[in-house]
Structures are given as structure tokens and as C-alpha cells.
């Protein structure tokens, strides 16, 4: 069905969500314009070479674009976590009892470039670079740009402009627009483990590496050039914090003391530490996601989350696919092919999109914060490791009945809210199964009791 639009759909933000949505809608023939504040050729890529974990949810959206195989060429499979202890002992924790399941490490910049390249091939999609959205006029459905100071007209506006969204900033001035933001007391800084000779990997390439140290931690994800992008999650203030590590000598000694194996592999550590920015970790919630068919929020603009389930990008891509599916729902289309799409039709689409996404977005936001404390405090803990072993045992012995929360989040497309509910039940099962097993002996796990507990808590 041909859709008539008097003005283009305008997407604010040409990042991952904005580019993916422009690609999908553009492939269907919608006239699209994308306003992106950054230049077409990003500068200082290394300082912003943030890596992301791509899971099944994101892969599903990329598959819909038709370019998933091309995109996975720049990704590296990660089969589990590699935990680095203070004495440099490494312990591998598989993500799943199924060895065929894995996450992908992918550079945000490279992924964004691929999506944008494919989108720019479409004649009905136009990018406007180096021009930020300053504000929007909700009544007129227009955008005032910051750099060129022009007024851009749109049939509808889709805000994909991140956690500090200018589109959302205009919406929160409305009556009955809920909004909240919550910061962790930790921030993060990107660092690097370079490749070895001939672009070899200096630590295991198929793992997400974690150095848990109680009140702080460091992680590292592999790059296709053999390097690793490291992220230090660290308190902003306190005896050991970003504020206290204020000299090269202090930083050098800190990494020698707390990350001795990584320290030996980071020749540019001090330059990276003082040149790269320290960024905050924020959870953002707002409701509603839309206003009268004139504007809708997608991804971080609607629900920024902390990165500790590796789901920020995946949740945003899931938003994109859900919104696209709503655009494809013919029951929401104009009844006549010669009638232009109007605000009523967009409003129907956006209402359905929010109904399907809000509870799930809230769920993953809450679980991401929980997982921060798990990764920081417990991944090196003996009881935590034992529970993981028991969980894998249950997945093998009861494959259709017991599925871990992590499995549901990372290796399925089941709703996040469902994964949260199942995760609570799973914890009750695990707590009862390990009770009294003080020597953490997997052979002592009572599978008959496990069967009874699964029936009791999961109704399976």
C-alpha cells in the first residue's frame, strides 16, 4: 500500500537506532530525513571506540534490514566471561550451557558506519550532518536546528537522539509528561589493550574480560584488529576514585596494584587515561513516549539504561523493530490509498508501540542496575560461581523447563518483563537447591528436588 506524506518523516539522531530505523522505513518507501549533530566523518574515533555487545535481539533487527551478514563481518563472537583475579588467575564462565550460543563484540562506530552506508544508498533518505536539534515546536511539528538556525518541517518527528535527547527535552515541558533520571555514583573511562605483533590478540579473543575489584571493575571487549577496548567503571569520588587518581604516578601505581596482568599489556595507559573523557552512567525514564502523533521517542531518548547487561543497543534495536512493525500493521494505515498519512494514523502507531515497549524498557533498566552490582561484587565469589554451575546443570537436565534470566535476555527475544519475572523465580529455586551445600559440590544437587521446585515456582 502506498503511503502519501506531505512532508518527510524526520528522525533526530543518526546513531545506531536512528540509522537502523531510517534504513527500515526507507526500504519501505517512506520519505525520510535524518538530522545528525556529528559530522559525516567522525573525528577522534579512537577516543570514542566504544564496543558494544550485540545479542539475539539486536541481530533480529539487523536481519530485518537484510544486511546482517555484512555487519557480522565486523563482529567477534564472545562465548563467555573471562574473570581476572587480583593474582592474575583467569576463570572462564560460559554464557550458556549451549556452546553454540554467544554474544558479538562490535565497534559502535563501525556498526554505525555500516548502517549509514546502506541507508544512504536509498534515494528517499536524506542525511543532514553537523546540525543539532535545538528544540521542537510540538504544535507545528517543526524542528529548530542549532548550527544552521533553520526551521525544518516534518510530517512526524522521531527522537533517536540519545540519553540527553533534545526532542525529549521539548516534550517534558508538556503537562503530565513524566520524567526521571538517576545517576550511579560510578562513571566510566575508555582505555585500550593494543594488538600484539601482526594484529594478534594478547588475551583470549572470544571472551568478555572482567576484572572485578569490589567497589570498581574493568572490562575489555575484543576488536577485529586484535586490540581490546577496555572500560574502567570507577567511583567519581572517594579514596579510590577518578577524583583521587589525579597524577600519572597515582594512575600508574593503581593499575599495577589492581590490574597487574592488564597493566603489562597497556603501553599507552597513562596517555589514554588523561586524554579520554570520564563519562557518567544514567538511567532515564519518561512516559508517554509520544505526543499526538507528532513526535515519538526511541532508544536511549525514551529509556537510557546503564550498560551492565549489554542491552542498551539491543533494547534500542528492539524499539526500532517494534516501531517498524507498527508501521507495517495495515490495521493502522489510512483506509484509503489516496488519503495522506496524518497525525491520527501516527498516533495509532505510536500508542501501540508504547504499549509493547514501556514495561519491557523499565524491566531491562532495573535488571541492568542489578547486574552492575553482580558483575562488580559477585562474579569472583565462590557461592555465585557455584550457583552458575547449578544453573547450567538445570538447563541441561531440564532444557525445556528451566531457562536462566541471562539466557532469556541475551539469547532470546522473549519480553524483558517476562525475563525479569522468571529470574525472580529462578533465584528462589537456586537458593533452595544450594542450601546446606557448604562445600559447593555439584554432585550433591538433588535433581528430584529441582524437578519439584521447577513445578512449584515456574509451573512447568
Curated annotation (Swiss-Prot):
Q: Where's it mainly located?
A: mitochondrion
Q: In which pathway does it act?
A: Cofactor biosynthesis; NAD(+) biosynthesis; quinolinate from L-kynurenine: step 1/3
Listed under catalytic activity are: L-kynurenine + NADPH + O2 + H(+) = 3-hydroxy-L-kynurenine + NADP(+) + H2O
Instruction: Return the SUPFAM superfamilies for the record.
Output: FAD/NAD(P)-binding domain
What top-level branch of life does the organism fall under?
Eukaryota
> Does the record's keyword annotation contain Mitochondrion?
yes
Q: Name the EC number(s).
A: 1.14.13.9
Give the protein's cofactors. FAD
Summary of the function given for this chain in its UniProt record: Catalyzes the hydroxylation of L-kynurenine (L-Kyn) to form 3-hydroxy-L-kynurenine (L-3OHKyn). Required for synthesis of quinolinic acid.
Q: What's the family?
A: Belongs to the aromatic-ring hydroxylase family. KMO subfamily.
Q: Under what name is this protein listed? A: Kynurenine 3-monooxygenase
Which source organism?
Dictyostelium discoideum (Social amoeba)
Amino acid at each position: 500500500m502506498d503511503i502519501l506524506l506531505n512532508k518527510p518523516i524526520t528522525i533526530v539522531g543518526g546513531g545506531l537506532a536512528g540509522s537502523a530505523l531510517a534504513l527500515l522505513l526507507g526500504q519501505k518507501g517512506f520519505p525520510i530525513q535524518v538530522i545528525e549533530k556529528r559530522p559525516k566523518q567522525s573525528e577522534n574515533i579512537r577516543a570514542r571506540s566504544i564496543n558494544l555487545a550485540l545479542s539475539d535481539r539486536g541481530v533480529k533487527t539487523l536481519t530485518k534490514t537484510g544486511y546482517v551478514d555484512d555487519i557480522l563481518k565486523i563482529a567477534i563472537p564472545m562465548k563467555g566471561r573471562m574473570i581476572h583475579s587480583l593474582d592474575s588467575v583467569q576463570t572462564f564462565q560460559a554464557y550458556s550451557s549451549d556452546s553454540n550460543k554467544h554474544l558479538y563484540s562490535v565497534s559502535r562506530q563501525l556498526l554505525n558506519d555500516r548502517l549509514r552506508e546502506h541507508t544512504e544508498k536509498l534515494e528517499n533518505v536524506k542525511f543532514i550532518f553537523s546540525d543539532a536539534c535545538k528544540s521542537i515546536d510540538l504544535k507545528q511539528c517543526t524542528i529548530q536546528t542549532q548550527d544552521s538556525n533553520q526551521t525544518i518541517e516534518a510530517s512526524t518527528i522521531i527522537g533517536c537522539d540519545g540519553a540527553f535527547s533534545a526532542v525529549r527535552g521539548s516534550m517534558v515541558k508538556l503537562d503530565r509528561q513524566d520524567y526521571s533520571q538517576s545517576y550511579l555514583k560510578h562513571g566510566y573511562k575508555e582505555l585500550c589493550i593494543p594488538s600484539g605483533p601482526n594484529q594478534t590478540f594478547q588475551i583470549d579473543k572470544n571472551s568478555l574480560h572482567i576484572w572485578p575489584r569490589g567497589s570498581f571493575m574493568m572490562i575489555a571487549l575484543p576488536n577485529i584488529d586484535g586490540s581490546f577496548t577496555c572500560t574502567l567503571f570507577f567511583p567519581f569520588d572517594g579514596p579510590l576514585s577518578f577524583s583521587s587518581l589525579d597524577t600519572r604516578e597515582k594512575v600508574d601505581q593503581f593499575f599495577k596494584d589492581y590490574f597487574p596482568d592488564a597493566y603489562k599489556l597497556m603501553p599507552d595507559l597513562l596517555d589514554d587515561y588523561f586524554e579520554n573523557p570520564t563519562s557518567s552512567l544514567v538511567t532515564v525514564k519518561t512516559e508517554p513516549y509520544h505526543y499526538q502523533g507528532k513526535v515519538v521517542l526511541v532508544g536511549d531518548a525514551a529509556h537510557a539504561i546503564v550498560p551492565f547487561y549489554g542491552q542498551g543497543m539491543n533494547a534500542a534495536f528492539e524499539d526500532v523493530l517494534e516501531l517498524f512493525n507498527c508501521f507495517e500493521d495495515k490495521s493502522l494505515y489510512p483506509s484509503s490509498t489516496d488519503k495522506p498519512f496524518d497525525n491520527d494514523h501516527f498516533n495509532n502507531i505510536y500508542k501501540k508501540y508504547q504499549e509493547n515497549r514501556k514495561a519491557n524498557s523499565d524491566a531491562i533498566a532495573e535488571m541492568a542496575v542489578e547486574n552492575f552490582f553482580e558483575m562488580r561484587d559477585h562474579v569472583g565469589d565462590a557461592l555465585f560461581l557455584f550457583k552458575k554451575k547449578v544453573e547450567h546443570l538445570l538447563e541441561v537436565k531440564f532444557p525445556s523447563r528451566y531457562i536462566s534470566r541471562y539466557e532469556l535476555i541475551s539469547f532470546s527475544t522473549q519480553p524483558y518483563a517476562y525475563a525479569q519475572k522468571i529470574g525472580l523465580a529462578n533465584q528462589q529455586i537456586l537458593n533452595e537447591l544450594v542450601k546446606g551445600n557448604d562445600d559447593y559440590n555439584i554432585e550433591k544437587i538433588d535433581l528430584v528436588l529441582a524437578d519439584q521446585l521447577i513445578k512449584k515456582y515456574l509451573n512447568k
